[in-house]
Amino acid sequence: MKGKFISFEGIDGCGKTTQIKFLEEYLLKQGYNILVLREPGGTKVGEKVRDILLDKNNFISPVTEMLLYASSRAQLVEEKILPAIEEGKIVLLDRFVDSSYVYQGYARGLGIEKVKVVNEIATMGILPDVTIYIDITPEEAMKRRGKREADRLERESWDFHKKVREGYIKLVKEFPKRFVFIDGMQELMKVHKDIIDVVKKYL
């Protein structure tokens, strides 16, 4: 039996990583075989790319940024995601191609189509069975981050993060069969329950 592929999206600080951890614990208790991955990263090569992308001292042009994300993604798909799905595992991925659509395509202004062409090569055309979008405001994201040191993307302007959120909401509306909108402003365990209710439908 083939596995499942579930991705999580949202602006920085929306709680993806926490909710993935909660979901992993829940699914392991149900007896499922789980692989948790993150983007950029998840492989030896990808983690090196991640260091470049998130280093606050680096100036990276929008096109370079798009290509670096795509290179990390290509390695992840071939080395980890496809083999895990073939082995019947449930892959929980913290960000995938939709992040590039909104961050580089929409917020950076490169255009969705340009990003799509590059990423169809990088992903070999695979898409998640379901994408869980956790929605919070940029104001809430900043509050949650608190005094933790921000990485290169987190240090972007207020307007940039507003555009990222707008981009996600457009994607949710454009691809309603794949995306599920989760209100991330709710209490932590209510968000977790909503996510479990969604995931159960795909298992």
From Swiss-Prot:
One GO CC annotation: cytosol
SUPFAM superfamilies tied to this protein: P-loop containing nucleoside triphosphate hydrolases
Gene Ontology biological-process annotations: dTDP biosynthetic process; dTTP biosynthetic process; dUDP biosynthetic process
Alphabetized InterPro entries for the sequence: P-loop_NTPase, Thymidylate_kin-like_dom, Thymidylate_kin_CS, Thymidylate_kinase
Binding, ATP: G10, I11, D12, G13, C14, G15, K16, T17
Reaction equations catalysed: dTMP + ATP = dTDP + ADP
EC code: 2.7.4.9
Family membership noted in the UniProt record: Belongs to the thymidylate kinase family.
Full protein name: Thymidylate kinase
Gene: tmk
